[in-house]
Design a protein with these regions (language model features):
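Amphipathic alpha-helical interface elements
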Residues: 1-189
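Short Lys/Arg-rich cationic patches that frequently serve as NLS/NoLS or arginine-rich RNA/DNA-binding motifs
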Residues: 184-203
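Conserved small/polar residues in nucleotide/adenosyl-binding loops
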Residues: 208-216
Length: 218
């Protein structure tokens, strides 16, 4: 069971990297100017000079020749860059319809990826699965319609359900009294992560049902 949970954690990390690449590329292609990977790498190199503290401990950029070589660490560092000291701020997230929701989604994906990357046991893998479920909900709030279609969000929700099941995260991670009813996976994820927000998380299937109803009602 632990091996299965750790395999799921590896898949969560991989999926978060793929999501991160997609978000960065979409944002990059919405801005004015060149949309090439080389232009992005030049931008990062310039920002490393302007803000060495923020861009500290970055993956090595040498030899990067395709978007597929970028990981969550690099992608989210660019997307979440406050750019306070940038000579030419891009404000990639600020150019979206819902900048706050986009920023929350990027943070959620980064958090889930980091948890999955460092998972060494079933409990940590379960936490990564819970955080991935929350990240999918945040992606729905920030990116539904563009660049993520309803069908794609549905696929992410199904992946989230699969990860939760394989990691045993549909029961509370902390032990509970026998008579207590196990909370929903996403709800226990809020408790574990110390979040206070109410009413925005439910099971992955409930969220997807809501998404489908919203889409068909347009």
């Amino acid at each position: 069971m632990q091996d299965e949970a750790l395999q799921a954690a590896f898949e969560i990390k991989t999926e978060c990297d793929e999501i991160s690449r997609r978000l960065l590329r979409w944002h990059w292609e919405q801005k004015p100017g060149s949309h090439s990977l080389d232009a992005l790498l030049r931008h990062i190199a310039q920002r490393q000079k302007e803000s060495p503290d923020y861009y500290d401990r970055m993956p090595d950029l040498s030899g990067k020749t395709s978007w597929q070589q970028l990981d969550t660490t690099l992608c989210m560092r660019v997307l979440l860059d406050p750019e306070k000291d940038a000579a030419k701020p891009l404000d990639l997230l600020g150019n979206t319809r819902h900048p706050g929701a986009a920023r929350r989604a990027c943070n959620a994906v980064r958090t889930a990826r980091n948890e999955a990357a460092h998972a060494s046991d079933r409990t940590a893998a379960a936490q990564a699965a819970i955080l991935f479920n929350e990240a999918v909900e945040a992606l729905e709030e920030g990116y539904a319609g563009a660049p993520l279609r309803t069908s794609e969000l549905g696929q992410y929700y199904r992946l989230a359900e699969d990860y939760l099941s394989r990691c045993g995260a549909k029961k509370p991670i902390a032990s509970a009294a026998p008579e207590e009813k196990a909370p929903r996976a996403a709800k226990s994820g809020q408790n574990t992560a110390g979040r206070k927000k109410e009413g925005t998380s439910g099971s992955a299937s409930v969220s997807y049902t809501h998404l489908r109803a919203h889409e068909t009602g347009r």
